[in-house]
Amino acid sequence: MQRPSNQLFDAYFTARTMRDVFSDQGRVQAMLDFEAALARAEASIGLIPTTAVAPIAAACQAGHYDFAALGEAIATAGNSAIPLVKALGKQIALQDPEAERYVHLGATSQDAMDSGLVLQLRDALQLIEADL
């Protein structure tokens, strides 16, 4: 898939650290951070077994995922969360098939995307504040 390039101006207008926050890797990791936090919160109130948290959290590393495949799936799914949550479930099932059923429990795709974006914005604000 051909993407527009910003190579001529990215370094001029944006710091590397800020580009990292809003990169594909940063976006996916932020949504995965939401999924791990959701599992921890749900386990803390007894909604899911505490034994499900470790396999879910372990699978919430962006490096586990094929970004090209995610990009293709996003094009047909209509949003980024649907294929990411499916891939997350498959990754969890490799370690603990029982834990897979608890991933994304009670959450919507919009929850994952919005919460991920807020985590990115938090990181961006910290960079801006540190630079003042």
Residue ranges and their predicted role:
Residues 1-132:
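A helix-coil-helix interface module used to build multimeric assemblies
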